[in-house]
C-alpha cells in the first residue's frame, strides 16, 4: 500500500510540475494582432517595458509609438521617439498615419489609449497596440519635440 501512495505522490508531483510549466509557457505567449510585418514579425497586443525600450533604442520606420496625451503633457516628458497625437485631434489627423504602420498607443495611465485604440480599429487600423500608461516607462523621458 505504501508503494501505491508513493507512486500516486510522484505522479501528482509530475502532473503539478507539468501544469506549472504549461501555465508559465502560456503566460509568456502573446496574442498577436494584424498581419505579418517586416521580416515576418507581427505586433503583439502586449510587450514588456524593456522590449519597448529596445524598440526606442533601435527604431523601426514601420512601428510608431504614439502619445495621445495633451501636447503640454507630451512636451513635459514622453517616451523617446514617440510622436504626439493628442486624443482630441488624432482622428482628424489619420491622413498623417499610414494605415499599414504598427502603432503602439499610450497615454498617462491607460484609459485614453484604450479609447483611441478602439477608434483606430473602427477607422480600419489593424496593426495597433494599447500599451497603457506612461507610468510603465521606467527610464528617462524626452522633453520638447
Language-model-detected regions and their locations in the chain:
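Short, surface-exposed ligand- or partner-binding patches at beta-edge/loop junctions that are enriched
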Residues: 106-107
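Structural scaffold elements adjacent to functional motifs in cytosolic proteins
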Residues: 65-67
